[in-house]
């Protein structure tokens, strides 16, 4: 199986989750507690960047997240062509 195929399989596994609880249980099995903490932090940073007009330093002080993490999330939110974060925010706006 090629590396790309493994990524598709993981994405399909997430699509098979029928509820928020299914996703949480899958993540608990798939990730270490530290990885889950990192994912939650990134998502919180992303929401803060998207909805609030705060500097990186203000976000760091508010959330206790490293400036490196904030910068990485901001780059993917604003500059990267994956549009993963933007796609989710667009879908949230539709509901």
Residue spans of the language-model regions?
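General nucleic-acid-binding
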Residues: 1-15
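Short, Lys/Arg-enriched anionic-surface-contact patches
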Residues: 23-42
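Short, amphipathic alpha-helical "recognition" segments used to contact nucleic acids or chromatin
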Residues: 39-54
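Recognition helix of helix-turn-helix/homeodomain-like DNA-binding domains
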Residues: 46, 71-78
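Short alpha-helical "recognition helix" segments of helix-turn-helix
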Residues: 57-64, 70
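Short, solvent-exposed alpha-helical "recognition" segments
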Residues: 75-87
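Intrinsically disordered, low-complexity basic tails/linkers immediately adjacent to helix-turn-helix/homeobox/MYB/SANT
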Residues: 87-95
């Amino acid at each position: 199986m090629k590396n790309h195929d493994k990524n598709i399989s993981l994405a399909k596994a997430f699509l098979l989750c029928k509820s928020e609880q299914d996703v949480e249980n899958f993540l608990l099995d798939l990730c270490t507690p530290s990885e889950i903490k990192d994912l939650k932090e990134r998502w919180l940073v992303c929401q803060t960047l998207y909805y609030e007009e705060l500097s990186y330093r203000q976000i760091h002080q508010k959330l206790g997240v490293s400036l490196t993490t904030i910068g990485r999330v901001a780059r993917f939110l604003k500059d990267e062509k994956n549009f993963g974060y933007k796609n989710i925010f667009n879908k949230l706006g539709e509901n």
